[in-house]
Amino acid sequence: MALCNGDSKPENAGGDLKDGSHHYEGAVVILDAGAQYGKVIDRRVRELFVQSEIFPLETPAFAIKEQGFRAIIISGGPNSVYAEDAPWFDPAIFTIGKPILGICYGMQMMNKVFGGTVHKKSVREDGVFNISMDNTCSLFRGLQKEEIVLLTHGDSVDKVADGFKVVARSGNIVAGIANESKKLYGVQFHPEVGLTENGKVILKNFLYDIAGCSGNFTVQNRELECIREIKEKVGTSKVLVLLSGGVDSTVCTALLNRALNQDQVIAVHIDNGFMRKRESQSVEEALKKLGIQVKVINAAHSFYNGTTTLPISDEDRTPRKRISKTLNMTTSPEEKRKIIGDTFVKIANEVIGEMSLKPEEVFLAQGTLRPDLIESASLVASGKAELIKTHHNDTELIRKLREEGKVIEPLKDFHKDEVRILGRELDLPEELVSRHPFPGPGLAIRVICAEEPYICKDFPETNNILKIVADFSASVKKPHTLLQRVKACTTEEDQEKLMQITSLHSLNAFLLPIKTVGVQGDCRSYSYVCGISSKDEPDWESLIFLARLIPRMCHNINRVVYIFGPPVKEPPTDVTPTFLTTGVLSTLRQADFEAHNILRESGFAGKISQMPVILTPLHFDRDPLQKQPSCQRSVVIRTFITSDFMTGVPATPGNEIPVEVVLKMVTEIKKIPGISRIMYDLTSKPPGTTEWE
């Protein structure tokens, strides 16, 4: 049986339940196996007005039973159930008579406990898939026999445990199992994320029909809880809140103002030099209209030249540290974020000093959201979540302040759409509540900095696979070992569609010599971008299909872009040296301004959740024989549609955004000096994150 390879229980097993001080009658316990989507499960359950609490996977069964939980949900996680370091759990949770829903890793765990087997498949599934369902199963009642879901896994159920039946399949892969008499259900996909179209129906079936929950957990309760927590923690002390002007920090400040006296709240807007065009001025004006007095600090010089302390190397587990390069000479995305986060804190401390306040009597408030903490693998969000990227508001220094109890984060249990609802409850104006998010590090994380191209040993082989994919209809006539790999990673339906697309369109697909951050299978991926160009007018539906298919076949690719303009004859294999210098930032600032101005004027800004505009160090259209150096850069437009920012899809031109609007953006951005090409990000999340860094 799976007691983390069967042996001993860890000393801290049981979380906060074992003291018996709480009672959760009617609530659902989510046992956290380390999933990036763990808190999304929590949010989806609460959206259905059912109270949920998250505890470690190793929480003992007796504690769950004694505390009155009505049902159990086991999250996904990055481990294999057979790994030596697989997390410990109490198998008795399956024998206490509580309905259980196992998601991804949770399903594999359930299957293994009851005698089934799990093994690593040759093909990962990362992305959106059509799966078949048995809609006579209580879990899938009211659904179609085929549904669109998000799958992100490498291990799969092989032999189904006795007493369970298969209730969903993705091709020949088991996607759902059930033992209805014991109310035990497992799904390989993620019903909690927006990319699973009817995931909420599945969760509702489990919570209401199977577990018998009642819906009496409301947003108003959570607002009151936030205010109570602020009052209790701050008392008569002062709070310094860093305001970006976005919805998160504004709602955070509104909560502080409601909970505390006005003279206790010190609102500061720091212009870090990475703001959008005229951003700081508009932030100050908007907040003054709300009656919030803001101290604006121009700290661009401090950020450009900022440094921080870092481990000697990623492998070095000793406490030894090194001083980083200055930010304007740094190319590592992780180091950039850490420098920016720590510089924010240093400047906040300077403000405290200038105002003659005692540091020990001042709290730092942030509008940190749940996705920030999950992607940073913060213990506040999840004790096991794998690091995807460091967020500027969750650096080591911030964590140290948090450990000291000096950080106030009233929105730490909220996701973006919930913050908007809360903002409306607090009577904030709609233009602020519905504003597109803008990251605290600003344009700094929208410049792909590089000194040299990113080309590893797998670069040539991956390019050969992409050539086969882009010309699949011709490639199938010429036997090749890599062709067999492509076929092994795709279904017959995929191959038929690929044949159709490549017969109709002349495509060129290749790797770009840069890397961006992504997420695959609950873990961080940091890898290549695939570019697609064509002499034909773009068929956007086909391009979106290719963007889903390519990362499934090539796990070293986490992003796919379409390159506007004529076919790329000679893909770049070098880069334009790019750092966070004023000239580089000025170029991106203008591109961002043009794109967002066109989106606003089109009236479609409300249809798009966020639209990062990214500057890459890529110079196309150079004759290699002339050995022209790389000196221009290219821009990426990243439209993104999501409900929670944990998963999402690009806006498809012609559907969610008019083609003419996108083409107008391309035309205006191309006029900016030093711009080589414009690209359109076709990638969903996963495998690509919202931002490129």
UniProtKB/Swiss-Prot annotation:
ATP binds at S244, G245, G246, V247, D248, S249, T250. The keyword Protein transport does not apply. Its EC number is 6.3.5.2. The active site is at C104, H190, E192. Optimum pH is 7.6. XMP binds at R337, D522, Q610, K685, E691. It is found in: Cytoplasm, Cytosol. CDD domains: GATase1_GMP_Synthase, GMP_synthase_C. Coiled coil: none annotated. One of its GO terms (molecular function) is GMP synthase (glutamine-hydrolyzing) activity. NCBIfam families: guaA_Nterm. This is GMP synthase [glutamine-hydrolyzing]. It comes from Mus musculus. The gene is Gmps.
